[in-house]
Amino acid sequence: MRQERVILLNEQGQPCGTLEKYAAHTATTPLHSAFSCWIFNEQGQLLVTRRSLHKKAWPGVWTNSVCGHPQLGETTEAAINRRACFELGADIDSLSPVYTDFRYCATDPSGIVENEVCPVYAAHIVSELQLNPDEVMDSQWSNLEDVLSGIDATPWAFSPWMVMQVSDVKARELLRKFANGN
């Protein structure tokens, strides 16, 4: 895979440059474009993944199915498909926006900051998983309600972006509808 870059954003959310992905993620990470996707199987179960210990930020933390950064000239939908294939070895369809104006800033225990405008999507998996161990160390198909209860009871056990995404009532309800096939 070619070297990934992040699309830098100004405070109005407009692109204002690019920076190599690993150079961008520091203690002073600039605002940049990202995405987050919650992937469900045909039984309505959510794919929860555990980030590889090789990840620069939040290694070993449980999170939603796949996250990443669109590349210059790439749509968010194309970027989600690219990362689902790269991280999970999976094909997805039925991409549906869940929380299009999600923005967050969080600092991991090592001091690395995430500072992202990060639209959230849901999708269906249409192939088997083939996890990339450099990206994902474990995964589990879980009932969405069990995951939401776990997040509510132990938010520290999940990535901060996952916790913040479902703290939005509308996003939580849209994920429930998607899981139930509505």
From Swiss-Prot:
Its main location: cytoplasm. Residues 30-164 form the Nudix hydrolase domain. One of its GO terms (cellular component) is cytoplasm. The active site is at 67, 116. Keywords: Cytoplasm, Isomerase, Isoprene biosynthesis, Magnesium, Manganese, Metal-binding. Its cofactor is Mg(2+); Mn(2+). Pathway: Isoprenoid biosynthesis; dimethylallyl diphosphate biosynthesis; dimethylallyl diphosphate from isopentenyl diphosphate: step 1/1. Mg(2+) binds at residues 67, 87. GO terms for biological process: dimethylallyl diphosphate biosynthetic process; isoprenoid biosynthetic process. Mn(2+) binds at residues 25, 32, 69, 114, 116. The keyword Hydrolase does not apply. It catalyses: isopentenyl diphosphate = dimethylallyl diphosphate. It holds the Pfam family NUDIX. One of its GO terms (molecular function) is metal ion binding. It is found in: Cytoplasm. This is Isopentenyl-diphosphate Delta-isomerase.
